[in-house]
Amino acid sequence: MGGNANGSVTTGAGIAGLGSPLILNNVIIRDNQSTGQGAGIYAAGQLLCTGCRFIRNISSANGGAYFTAYAGVELWWRYAMTGCYFSENEAIQGSAGYHSGYSWAYLGYNTYACNKATYGGTVSLNGTAYASKTTLVNNTFVNNRIEATGGVINEIKGGSAVYANLNAASTLSIVNNTIVGNHASCYKNGTPTADFYGAAVHIYNGTPFIFNNVIAGNRSTSIYTGDVYNAGQPATTGYNIFSSTDNIGITPAETDILGTSVDASILLLGNMLESNIVEGDIVPVLALNGGSIETVKVKRRFFGSNAINVLPASQFEEKLLKGDVDNTIELRDKLIFDQRGVERSTDGTSSIGAYEYGKGGTGITETTITTSPVQTYQNDPILYLSAAMVLQDVRIFSMTGSTVIHLGEVNAGETPVNISRLYPGVYISVSYTH
């Protein structure tokens, strides 16, 4: 907290990891400044962060909150940022995070708000040497900015939410995110540059799979796009909400929902999301809506006349999404929760975006279930389940949807569960009754 790297050492003002893995749980990293890469964290080895908060970390180079450094030609580890909060971080590229060398990464259940870059990317994903896989799932990007200055090559500038310059064979899976109210601009001598393509999601190279997202209401000084720009391989999309056809540089699928213009979509988003409209721009409101970090509440389930709770269960299969939504490497599972840890509906009424409409933080629909057959209490390191009836297939899930404890059938009465091996964090218990 409050570190400076501006002398002989210019990187990693908060934490400098020079090779060993960095595993951070529930750590606050704030108010660090560096003249080099990575004001909050500089990681030359593996970086795994869960439940951390990165606030006001400022780099004069790349990676305000964190910078991952890797120049090898073969991948030995993956990066994972899970359930973290990034706000008011600044850098040239990657105000929240900069992945260099390669971008085999899992970014899930995070919130990125009010970060600013002067070149590209709140999250900047880089590495063209070989193919990698990156998944962004159940994240919220709101009120982030790119403020670029016109130069020789302006096409590579952008990504007020996500910037990607990857190997052409690298997959970038963007799944069930809410990306709203972000701004990208590029001026030269006070005039918007004509060759600027800056968008909220800016893919300079790579193979994108874009499913189930709200990517709308994002502004840009570009005359070409504002929500999504893709100069990489053809994008595969489905069940997204976009501002309009002229605000995306991709071909939408039949299941994608589009507004008629950015201005019109901002009004529709203002009706759908907890937000304010200020001078014609949407400013989503973040709050603790039942999860461990701030999210944007869906207050109405319609984008204009289009319902947003239309996702079939098949739309959460990893094989379709081409993304590792539960951070287990293998593409054989499915997305189970929203960003808060609320269980998603499987009856064809799940919601587009990071927030499952109509469900509270417990994952129980408030209008249909008012009591639970299971009560819990903890006496470290034992969690006690007290059930009035036999429970079937009792599981405890992490926030990423991975099963961390599988109890199977549990009899009525009190059942002790040893949770000493679990990291501190938020977990969800799911059970079934006859």
Set out the residue ranges of the language-model regions.
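Beta-strand/loop edge motif enriched in small/polar residues
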Residues: 1-14, 31-33
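C-terminal outer-membrane/trafficking sorting elements
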Residues: 365-432
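Short coil/loop residues immediately preceding or within conserved phosphate-binding loops
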Residues: 12, 159, 198, 331-332, ...
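A short acidic/small-residue loop/turn micro-motif
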Residues: 250, 345-353, 408-413
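Surface beta-loop-beta hairpin patches that serve as ligand-binding interfaces in beta-rich domains
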Residues: 305-362
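Predominantly extracellular beta-rich ligand-binding scaffolds that present long acidic/polar faces
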Residues: 9, 15, 21-26, 41-52, ...
